[in-house]
Amino acid sequence: RESFLCFLPLIIAILFGLMETSRFTIITTVVIWYAGVLGARITLQENLNKFFDKRSKRFFLFASTLFVGLFILLDWLRQAQGELVAYLVLERLKAYLFGYLAAFSNWVTMIHDGNIQFGQSTFAGPLSLTGIVERKFGSYGPILIAGDLSTNIYTALRGLIMDFSILGTGMIMILIGWFGSITYQNVIRGKLFFLIPLTLFYAFTLYSPLISIFHYNSLIMSWVILAAFFLLAKPIVQNSWDKDGFTGIVFNQ
């Protein structure tokens, strides 16, 4: 029962993704779900020294196989259930999984640091919501990476470099790593409110091969809701820690 409830969001996301023939729904749900799983494991201090145990490896193998299968199925559905050409599907799969490396490499050789946008690309969603900037839909234009094969996936680094330059991005990455370490240590100590920035850090990292997760206000609302839950419910973490670590949460009556 607990396992079913744990995987229920993924099942729902896959069903919606198949109905909408959309990879976005599935991928973003997996990212948020796994960021939550990582946060839970750290809170419970569950096998932190063996984070990638046999169970995790089996899960990753199964998830990778399932993703490839879903990619092929969705690609076929998007082509109006036409002829399934293995070569073309394989080329699109390679472009989706690895094309960002070539796309980002080609783009970064053509840039200059003169036009810095100060967050307009990385934080396009919140800035658009507040009316500070007008978000451009479609993110970035496609670029040829091999023959007629193109992609518009450049990783989150493109947005960071456009916003803060290459040097500024390097400094920001150092600060992000330091901040992630601080939040991790606070969660280990039982300060559950720090789960919000920690899981956000994990989600940003997991989604970074595609684009900044801050492009999507609907995703950011997940953490806004979580923050509201902690602030309104005022959970109190029990101070009774034993060799098994975290013991539970008690709520005010």
Show the residue positions of the predicted features.
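Small-residue-enriched transmembrane helix-hairpin modules in multi-pass membrane proteins
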Residues: 60-179
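Hydrophobic alpha-helical segments of polytopic membrane proteins
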Residues: 2-79, 86-87
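Extended hydrophobic/Leu-rich segments
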Residues: 48-51, 114, 236-237, 246
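Alpha-helix capping and helix-coil boundary motifs
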Residues: 3, 81-85, 133-136, 209-214, ...
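Hydrophobic alpha-helical segments
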Residues: 152-253
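Short, amphipathic, aromatic/basic-enriched membrane-interface segments that mark the entry/exit
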Residues: 1-2, 140-143, 188-194
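Juxtamembrane/interfacial segments around transmembrane helices
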Residues: 32-39, 57-69, 110-121, 222-229, ...
